C-alpha cells in the first residue's frame, strides 16, 4: 500500500518481479541490474518481509559506501518506517542525533567503516539481524573499501548465518562467482 500511495509505484519492473521469489524464499540475492532500475525497492521489500512477517522484532542492516548515500537511504527508509512503526538509525561516524538511535533501531543504515566499528565495540547489536543489504556491492573489488566490506559481510555471516543477504550493484563483474560466495 505504501509504495503505491506514497511513491506511486503501480507495478514492479521485470527484474524486480523476478527477484521477488528469492526475496520471499529468504534466499541470498545478488541483484545486478542497471542504475535507477529499482534495486533499492527490492531491498526495502526484503527488509519489510523479514521485519514484519518472517522475523518480527529482528533488525536489518543496510550497508552503503558513502555518507551521502546513507543519508539518502535514511530519508527513504524513515518515510517508510514512519508509516509502519519501524525505527531507523543512521551510522556514518558522526555524533548526530540519528547516531544515537543506533541501539534502538529496527533498520540500521551505515557505512562499512561504521559497521566495522560497531561490530568491534557493540557486537550485541548484531545478535538479532535477520537481513543485510550491501549496496554498491561491486566495491567489494575496490582496494580501499573492498576489504572492510568483505570482512563485515564475513563477520555478519558468522554471527548470523541465517540472515538473508541482499547484494545490490549496477556494475558488478563475475556475478556467478560472487553469487556463489554469497551462498
Question: Which residues does each predicted region cover?
Answer:
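Conserved P-loop/Walker A NTP-binding site and adjacent catalytic elements of P-loop NTPases
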Residues: 6-183
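Conserved adenine-nucleotide phosphate-binding loops and their immediately adjacent elements
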Residues: 1-5
